[in-house]
Amino acid sequence: LSTRRQRQMCIRDSYNTMVKEKQVFLPIQRDHVRLYACGPTVYDRIHVGNARPLVVFDVLVRLLRAAFPKVTYVRNITDVDDKINSRAAERGISISELCEQTIFSFHKDCKALNVLSPDIEPRATEHIAQMIAMITGLIEKGFAYEAEGHVLFSIEKMPDYGQLSGRSLDEMVAGARVEIAPYKAHPADFVLWKPSKAEIPGWDSPWGRGRPGWHIECSAMSAGYLGEEFDIHAGGLDLVFPHHENEIAQSRCAHGTAQMAAFWVHNGYVTVEGEKMSKSLGNFTTVEDALQRHRGEVIRFSLLSAHYRAPFDFSDAALQQARTVLDKFYRAVSVADRADIITDLTLLDTEFITALADDMNTPLAISCLHRLAVEANKGQLASARQLLSCASMLGLLTDENLSLIHI
């Protein structure tokens, strides 16, 4: 069966935030998919809301790798940020010590959730030279300007600014995380470089000792590893504006390209009783704490039980339900041989793959797993094999010890 057929089955319709509708996914390079996802700012342990994009885009990468000869997955580490500086000072430890501790914990949480490592995991602090070069180019081309030790991007020089978020300039100024400052030519102009005081991290630059703005970090790293234009940029819904909007502006203007990424994919929020889970509201559960009560696979399954673009309401009841279903699935696959897992998409259950191909509809895909489990419990070995293979595509039912318990 042809590789072309596998690709057609992989992502038939994927929602693209840029155009606000589903589109057929075709990579820029026929045999190579390039994907960038925004990673953590390493000042604290991740909570379940932070874990959702990790799990969702892990499934996306697994699906892409099953369909295409080469996938390059880049997920960055933001290790220069004012939150990091403040947290290190609060704890009385060095910034480097805080970052290393947090990165170690992050990787530990990813492993517990069965989130595969990206092909490349660049750290912002290791790419300052590339950021300075990109900012210099933006100034030379007239898209950025220096003011009081800061370098700012002039959003009025970018006619398409606001296309991703669909916001007008007035809405942007009124929106969250737009800092009004007297040195800005326009209130919505955003920082590319800012000065650093002696006690916080800084690097020498043409504009004095300072540090990069948040947005330039991802633009420089994605271009360095994936090129000036690449296939998919992924992240949480809260990153659409200002982060991704600003990435697009500075990247397109720096490189003179029509786009930064062809597809923009964003996951919905994790909520608690209908309210967004966030550290600022204090209604969060860290992955570390959740793992004290449930194994990582249960958390992963619960996050996949809702469509990735819809809100997911996190609760103990949701986790208990996930555990019950997983136990049922493990009983059903106990007769299957793990050596016979199917990896060819064209041989997997058609309804399951069709569900994933339609904008990664994991709830519908999971309903297919329920059907296969019912058939497997009736003694249909082929269905048990399909259940194990399809679940593997979601990063589930991978614990051989749990399968053995149910034999």
Where are these regions (language model features)?
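Alpha-helical recognition segments enriched in aromatics with Gly/Pro capping
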Residues: 5-8, 12-43, 58, 107-108, ...
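N-terminal, positively charged nucleic-acid-binding surface of large information/translation enzymes
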Residues: 19-22, 28-114
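Conserved adenylation A10 loop of the ANL superfamily
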Residues: 47, 215, 406-407
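Short, glycine/charge-rich beta-strand/loop segments that flank catalytic centers
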Residues: 77-82, 103-106, 116-131, 149-158
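Short, polar/flexible loop-turn hinges at active-site or ligand-entry regions and domain interfaces
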Residues: 91-97, 118, 309-313
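Short catalytic-loop micro-motif centered on adjacent basic/acidic residues
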Residues: 118-122, 233-235, 377
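Structural preference for alpha-helix termini/caps and helix-kink/transition segments
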Residues: 276-278, 282-405
